[in-house]
Amino acid sequence: MDKGINQIINSYILCLQKENLKFTKVYLFGSYAKNKQSAHSDIDLAFIFDENKQIDYFDLQVQMLSLASYIDTRIEPHPMSSEDFTPENPLACEILNTG
């Protein structure tokens, strides 16, 4: 992966931490993780949260997308609870296989 993408991801993670978002894991997945990105690819990032029932994940994704726009509009955050992050979940399975 190129340094520029690493820098973008790290900047975004710092931005989220400054907003006091308490995720436990971050996964890069999708085309960038597979090194098959194009000029129009987004940067898929999965964020795993332990506060399973206390978070409205739709509102959280909206907040995370808003913050992403300040760093790089290609960032596509995917917040998930640790409870939902299992091999039985199709999105989690893809993240685990390609992330």
Across the structure, where does each feature detected by a protein language model lie?
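Catalytic core of pol beta-like nucleotidyltransferases
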Residues: 1-25, 34-39, 50-99
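Glycine-rich beta-strand-to-loop/alpha-helix junction loops that act as flexible
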Residues: 29-31
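Short beta-strand->loop micro-motif that forms the acidic, two-metal-ion catalytic signature
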Residues: 44-48
